[in-house]
Design a protein with these regions (language model features):
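C-terminal motif of bacterial Sec signal peptides marking the signal peptidase cleavage site
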Residues: 18-20
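Short beta-strand edge/turn micro-motifs at domain boundaries
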Residues: 120-135, 141-193, 300-307, 314, ...
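A broadly structural signal marking compact, well-ordered functional cores
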Residues: 24, 225-361
Length: 361
């Protein structure tokens, strides 16, 4: 009976003894998790990237291209792999819940890649947002491996829980830890997202102003599409004060059609030193139709307001149907807080852009 009791006791204790001998501790699990983050599937950084894109995306209308996400995850993993971590012994907080201190020196990605990104943004390699981001992330991934810049040493406590025979790290703790270790990790996207979002804004501004295509402009300006369309109609199509009422509707329709014939292409912005400052080349084929219509109208002699009104509207309709253009030209437009705040003032940079696209009579 005693021998049987001893055997039974050994049978019961054996799993516990084996756990103590070969089982994993909470701090070992934390260390292996860090190694997996450095060497395993980069998709482990997906939640961190998604959170960063959501926060940065609140400032942009354009969205992160899907093709950019995988290289961005590899960039984050390369940055994380450059950091040395010291895992201290775990302390038990409560039953099967442990605190594991991790000491490390975070990489400062704003300092590591920021200057190189701004230099690239001053002369972007492509007019395409995706192509530029792919090139930038390739260069930045090399930078974090070759010349990383670090911040001040810090310690993060990870909460590690044991369930049955496995451990897990609290997801909130893990994401906070990754964000702390990768300070400024959205620097590439913030730099170039702002650049190409500005290109999209200026294009949408011109499309709304000249063509009445307001959907994208509404997004950029926090308007509804109806509000943006009212902005488009305001003042622009007011007829001359002495135009006969019978010709007002035709005048407005002719003007809208004439403006829609305007031709321009907004180039890739170039970042300038300072906050929110860009230079943008706009390639324009001047729409001379309005000036030519008025010139033709002014050659005639009219003996009544109705006769003059009919002639003016007829000239506008003629050139709206068969527009005339000048020689292609490129205008460099500075875009910053000052130029945007003075856009509706005569002689401003934005007003000059408008009159280059559609010369006044």
């Amino acid at each position: 009976m005693r021998k049987l009791s001893v055997l039974l006791l050994c049978t019961l204790l054996c799993p516990v003894l084996l756990w103590g001998c070969t089982g994993q501790s909470a701090d070992e699990y934390a260390g292996e998790t860090i190694t997996d983050l450095k060497e395993g599937d980069p998709s482990a950084f997906s939640r961190l990237l998604d959170a960063g894109l959501e926060e940065s995306g609140a400032d942009f209308v354009i969205q992160c291209p899907e093709e950019v996400k995988e290289p961005y995850l590899k960039f984050l993993q390369a940055a994380f792999a450059s950091i040395e971590f010291e895992v201290a012994s775990a302390s038990e907080r409560s039953d099967d819940v442990y605190s594991v201190p991790i000491t490390y020196t975070p990489i400062d990605l704003a300092q590591t890649v920021g200057a190189a990104n701004e230099e690239t943004a001053a002369d972007p390699p492509s007019a395409d947002f995706t192509e530029t981001m792919l090139a930038v992330l390739e260069a930045d991934t090399k930078l974090v491996a070759d010349d990383p810049v670090y911040g001040a040493e810090t310690t993060t406590d990870l909460t590690v829980s044991r369930t049955d025979d496995s451990f897990s790290i609290a997801e909130e703790d893990l994401q906070s830890f990754l964000a702390s270790a990768l300070s400024g990790y959205m620097t590439p996207y913030d730099t170039f997202g702002a650049l190409y979002d500005m290109q999209d804004f200026l294009t949408s501004y011109l499309d709304a102003s000249f063509k009445g295509e307001v959907a994208q402009f509404a997004l950029h300006t926090d308007r509804t599409e109806d509000e943006a369309y009212e902005w488009y109609l305001a003042d622009t199509f007011d007829p001359p004060a002495d135009l006969s009422q019978a010709y007002v509707a035709r005048y407005q329709a002719a003007m809208q059609n004439l403006l829609k014939q305007s031709s321009y292409t907004v180039g890739t912005p170039r970042l300038e030193p300072g906050l929110f400052s860009y230079q943008i080349d706009v390639t324009i084929t001047p729409n001379n139709s309005l000036a030519d219509a008025y010139h033709e109208f002014e050659q005639g002699t009219y003996y009544s307001i109705d006769e003059a009104s009919e002639a003016l509207v007829a000239a506008l309709e003629k050139y709206a149907a068969a527009p005339t253009y000048g020689a292609e030209t490129t205008l460099t437009v500075p875009v910053n807080m000052e130029t945007l705040s003075t856009a509706d003032q005569e002689g401003s940079d934005m007003a000059t852009l408008a009159t280059t696209i559609l010369p006044s009579p």
